Each structure stands twice: as structure tokens, then as C-alpha cells.
Amino acid sequence: MTDFTLNAQVRSDLGKGASRRLRHSLNIPAVVYGGDKEAQSLTIVAKEIAKLFENEAAFSHVIELNVDGAKQNVVVKAMQRHPAKGFIMHADFVRVVAGQKLTAVVPVHFINEEAPVKKGGEISHVESQIEVSCEAKDLPEFIEVDLGNAEIGTIIHLSDLKAPKGVEFVALAHGDDKAVANVHAPRVAPEAEEGAAE
């Protein structure tokens, strides 16, 4: 039993046109795969999945997915949102199998942001989520990024972060040392630059 549950139905009407029709009927398309079983295309009520993921913890916890009465434990693998309005357009779930590693996205929590700001810096959050690989039992609620010692010009990469025990950063494992955040000098408006030149 998990703290998070979600209902879904098997979807047979596939394709872009079908996905558009689904969204017009206030549902969204989704897929669940992994666990040595075939992938299933699903339909989920948009309001239900939106409510579930209002709780940030749902991104990094096992979810009991009820597909037409058949229950399976999953974690969210990826989620597509509308670029302007932010609502969920599509979700990918991966089945949880004891003893097997899975990949999932977990939120990033930035702490001590006031330190570089006091030094005159501005912070850019490059990543709000990080993809990790681990067993379900080791899945962290979030990845903490401490900006307490950051100076202007500091770029924090994945390699600067300490992964929790049993957890691997997927991008880093593939040689992609992504930037997670950076601290830069305040941007000067063009008018201010012209005034300073005079």
C-alpha cells in the first residue's frame, strides 16, 4: 500500500488525433511500462492527475496505479506539460519491481539562496528536476542543492552534488555533467548602461 493512488483505463484509440480528442474530453494520455511486461497505453482523468501532483512528493514516491481494477506499483518517469499554461499533457510511468533499478525524476530543492544574493548575485535555476537511477526503496524525495558558498560566477553542476546512498544521476552516468544552477551578476538594463557611459 502506498500513500498515493491513481485510477486509469486502458486506451486503444492511439495517435495524435486521439490524444487531442482525449484532452478535449478532460482526460490525458499516459503510458506505463517496465517490469518485464508489455507497455500499456492509458487514459487518466486530467483533474485527478493534476490533484495528485499538486503534492511534490508524488514525483518521488511509489504510486498505486489502478488500471481497470488491476493494481500495480509505479513511479513517474516523465511528464509533459503545456509550455504556456503548465497543465499536464502526458505522463510516463514505470513499474516498480523489487530488487530492480528504475529511473525516475525527483525535484530539486535549493537552500541558502540568500547567501549569494547578499553578495550581489542573481541565481538562475537551470534544472528543477533531476533524473535518477535507483531501487524504489532508495528513491529520494528531492535532491538538495546548497548555494551557501556560491559566489558570483559560480556554476553548480551535477558532479558538485552528493547523490544519496544507492542513487545515481542518470545524465552524469552518461557523461553529461549538466549545470543545475548558476550565480551571475545582475543584468544591467540598456538605459542604465547608456547613462553610465555619459
From Swiss-Prot:
One of its GO terms (molecular function) is structural constituent of ribosome. It holds the Pfam family Ribosomal_L25p. InterPro entries: Rbsml_bL25/Gln-tRNA_synth_N, Ribosomal_bL25/Gln-tRNA_synth, Ribosomal_bL25_b-dom, Ribosomal_bL25_C, Ribosomal_bL25_long, Ribosomal_bL25_short, Ribosomal_L25_dom, Ribosomal_uL5_bac-type. One of its GO terms (biological process) is translation. It comes from the Bacteria. CDD domains: Ribosomal_L25_TL5_CTC. GO terms for cellular component: cytosolic large ribosomal subunit. Belongs to the bacterial ribosomal protein bL25 family. CTC subfamily. Part of the 50S ribosomal subunit; part of the 5S rRNA/L5/L18/L25 subcomplex. Contacts the 5S rRNA. Binds to the 5S rRNA independently of L5 and L18. This is one of the proteins that binds to the 5S RNA in the ribosome where it forms part of the central protuberance. This is Large ribosomal subunit protein bL25. It comes from Pseudomonas putida (strain W619). The lineage of its organism: Bacteria, Pseudomonadati, Pseudomonadota, Gammaproteobacteria, Pseudomonadales. The gene is rplY.
